[in-house]
């Protein structure tokens, strides 16, 4: 029985020498037993190393084990453990359950039970207590230490409550993995497995109390125990302080020595690896700089390395993406110029959640194979999403989100067309709740396409049929966990999930790409993992009856804990991993990314359930727990030392100036320490380095070539021309086709339009149009084509939009106007009480008749209905005032009209037409109600963007000529009335201020006869207009001399007639162009607005003014006089080809 240490710094060759001695001894003693104990994650690599080193390429009498594997090997021999080992998933489930059961007994933690992450925290503290052999008695001692500290006492009381309930649950059925070694110590004396064996321990930086206890037993039974210790030989006999680099190693050696002395075990002189090799460093024989780093980093005092060297470099980059990009450029150089293999290179970071995907993407762009070493969370896997969304369907009673998460997980039997059709219907009618799914859906919503109710109801019936058993089981207050799990399993079987997953696996394998192989391995494991979680729930909680939400939370905890471990699909590839977790072996170059403050060392935002001060208090009373933050900081330096000294030839350190969100960040203190050791070490700026070495990186080089071709004006430099010819000649090949790249770089938009035949097939022989359609064409011909040619439309949603509110106002106003007519009450004589009661009734009827019942479905909708009533009351009051201010009476409401010519059959409705008859003359006033804040703009009318009022005036006059053939028809004006209930500042004349804000805007006949008919306040002496008058109902005011001011919106009667003729001709021209197949991208741009701003088709039209061939149609800004002059010269306009209204093209 003996104990011996193998001592040396990182890279000295401790493992190599240890394994060499074991192999030699095993060959000399073929019947001897040799055990090598390593950390769990190192077992596979150690086996590979030994097989490679062994002359017979086999390890017949050498066992490579972890502590847990050793325990199970001995249990097979002695028995002693009939209990199931509880892994993290099961542990989390039990912790969640006992916390829920005990939440009313908890003093501090009761409110945290449902907080995400708290189960993990509590599970962590329970594991820690078990790992350090702390049970109820020890917790009681901890409470005595905490006397006088109420907060800590309450914490410990709650921990005891949960821990006791946890241990009671386990009883004789389960055992924590942390307690396995304690159990092993109880039975190891009955085992002969380790008797007279030679035991070697390698790769450990320290041991837990349970492991030390086991080692004391092993020392007594084994022939010898040999332990590798990472430490400078000069530090062997020196006591290590906590802040020193080798404190952990020294503490481990000291404890093992004490165990040996206590048991009177022989302690052999240590094997000093470096001394035996004559000071020769096994790992760093090619790099004096890396050898100097190993000897001096985190040492006090340190020795500076003053020679020039390029084995260690520091590079500053703009952000993590720039770090990764520059690292990949250097990797490409190493592969090309220094003939490195992929497996010789590793990339590590302390923030894999940031760098993992970025590095992977850059390596793939460069065509470099890589393996990202991390355990993948299974929450995003389709099978888990299938189950979680199914649970949510029941938990949230068939709400939209849960239903469509389920349908879109990719494992149902519905086609995407069926799902899309079904989703459109559900959204259009706001369907939620199981009750709605139990009744056939018969209503249709407004759309350009036929609503296929048969298909929609088929999907509804399938969902209802397949979910009813699950719903009934999960919502029953009598269902046990076993029954609930069975119901979920039956759902998996109903949808044949196992078979579908098998098809996915075969598909991924057939595709053959590395990423597909990894996905195949993930999918191969997932179904088994899900069933194991089900089994664990049934084992642990089988006959318990839990509330649905609690059942879901516990199962979800299981899913969150589960991770898929993936094995690299190839040996020769770059390893990308975490600085602490990833095992690096025999690498020549190490790229360390993200060497920034907060990552190295890693920021610790919280101290867990027990704070640092509380842990230190227990440490002062010799109660050992996990390290404090301060101790962890020292440990981090030791782990950094181990990883920085892994490469044999090159160490590349990178840091960012900005984080991924663009915030400024600092470099890590580590770089300062390295710079002091290497005073001649320069920090490179990745942003300033030449791009010449970026060229030949397959897809990556191609991406840089693209940027140069796009951005460089004039002749490209010779270097880039040569690179271009390399790609063209095929000497460099990437996954991206150069032809496709060039098509994108030099793409120009050429638009030929449609043929007349195609246009007629799309639109018919005659356009069935509205004013809105013509305005859409005037704004952009392509947008018109998408909406009216291809019949694209926005998805109907179960909500109230501005157009809906406008429709509601219109209907309520129409009902109000008709009711007045039925009651034979004139607007001029409308009593206030009748107006108010009638308004309430009309809004109520409009709401009841509106759409799909949405106004009755939520508090917000009910509020909107109230708001509509308030605005209607204000509108009827204002309209009454406006009519009473003049002499006109409403002649018709919602007046239908149509107009047909060669290409266009125009149809529409005029909200209101007011009439006044005098001396055989009929004056016509047109009003259009708007729910927004629309203002009349003569320039917009000229360009075709605002045609409504002109079209309505023309149509109204035509209708009146038919109805009153013996009268002269005269236009009085056209107006927008904006439906609103404006807020005004408090003043003595609130009503007057509101009336001014609600005054109609539009265009008024400038006749001195007509204006007083619209507003009698303009009645002056002897047929003249009253001077210095401003109307509160129409856009007219007069100056001191009785003439119109510039602010008045007036036109002569002949100008109004010319305007209506111009609009007719303009729409004729538009319809002619549409039928000729004009569909060009030509959105207008005027001042600070353009046609694209509120366009519904931005995501599909492809318009990009940066691309050649696309440009805006810039509208020239015109004043009123210029517009009238142009309208009068309409022949000049209509002689031109397209929408050429003096507009110019430009980006």
UniProtKB/Swiss-Prot annotation:
- Segments crossing the lipid bilayer: none
Q: What is its EC number?
A: 3.1.-.-
Any Gene Ontology biological process = double-strand break repair via homologous recombination
Residues that hold [4Fe-4S] cluster according to the record: 780, 1092, 1095, 1101
Question: Pfam families per the record?
Answer: ADDB_N, PDDEXK_1
What UniProt keywords apply to this chain's record, in alphabetical order? 4Fe-4S, ATP-binding, DNA damage, DNA repair, DNA-binding, Exonuclease, Helicase, Hydrolase, Iron, Iron-sulfur, Metal-binding, Nuclease, Nucleotide-binding
Q: Which domain of life is it from?
A: Bacteria
For this chain's record, the cofactor binding note is:
Binds 1 [4Fe-4S] cluster.
GO MF entry, a single one:
5'-3' exonuclease activity
Which residues bind ATP per the record? 8-15
Give the InterPro entries listed for this entry. ADDB_N (IPR049035), DNA_helicase_suAddB (IPR014140), P-loop_NTPase (IPR027417), PDDEXK-like_dom_sf (IPR011604), PDDEXK_AddAB-type (IPR038726)
Needed co-factor(s):
Mg(2+); [4Fe-4S] cluster
| Other observations noted | Despite having conserved helicase domains, this subunit does not have helicase activity.
Q: Please report which protein family the annotation says this sequence is part of.
A: Belongs to the helicase family. AddB/RexB type 1 subfamily.
Q: Which PANTHER family match?
A: RECBCD ENZYME SUBUNIT RECC
HAMAP family from the UniProt entry: AddB_type1
What NCBIfam families does this protein's entry cite?
Answer: addB_Gpos
- Tell me the function of this protein: The heterodimer acts as both an ATP-dependent DNA helicase and an ATP-dependent, dual-direction single-stranded exonuclease. Recognizes the chi site generating a DNA molecule suitable for the initiation of homologous recombination. The AddB subunit has 5' -> 3' nuclease activity but not helicase activity.
Summarize subunit and interaction data from the UniProt record for this chain. Heterodimer of AddA and AddB.
Q: What is the recorded name of this protein?
A: ATP-dependent helicase/deoxyribonuclease subunit B
Gene name, Swiss-Prot/TrEMBL = addB
